[in-house]
Amino acid sequence: MNLQSGQNIPLQQSTIRLNLQYPAKSGFKGEPDTCLFMLNAQGKVSGDSDFIFYNNLSSPEGAVRLVTGSQQASIEIALDRVPANVSKIAITVVIDGEDTISGLSLLSIQAPGIADFQAETQGRSEKAIILGEVYRHNGAWKLRALGQGFNGGLEPLAINYGVDVAQPAPQPAKPARISLEKKLETRSPRLVSLAKKASVSLTKNKLDTLEAAAAFVLDA
């Protein structure tokens, strides 16, 4: 059965296999990656281990497994082993690099013997797409086709689903160099001209690039 965006189909099997294909057009320099998010009733992951991707290929209990390949991936879901707090599993494809979804010549998901879905790629500017989802409904499981684009790459998508993404440590700020003239002007305006003369003298003698400690006795 060929699904259209928004359509769903019941899943009768206890274990399903999903095959994704995303061959790229000529000149495509990015790298498509399949990412899965095991979501609770609030649409968020309950922990970072519920984020299945190239660095974490299976869920802790082994209910969801991801196998990645060149411009393709396969997913195996043991529906009867999915934790009770997981309401749905979002199936996404993210482009790593400067390219977008429009750089793919095909973007499809197939459940052999059940259904398949092909998402539109032409003219799309998004770097990520929610291709479909496997979700609970009245005590059973269903597969829904989506093809919903998402602006941004993997990081904003993961954050949207509640993944705690590590941020790079900020670079320490360089200490500000205090202007001697400003300090003197605040405390003793009479010494401003002295500081200016000292600066001119250092420049003439090519010593202005050297740093040295100096002390001024300010007679209040």
Residue ranges, per PLM feature:
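Intrinsic-disorder/low-complexity signal
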Residues: 1-220
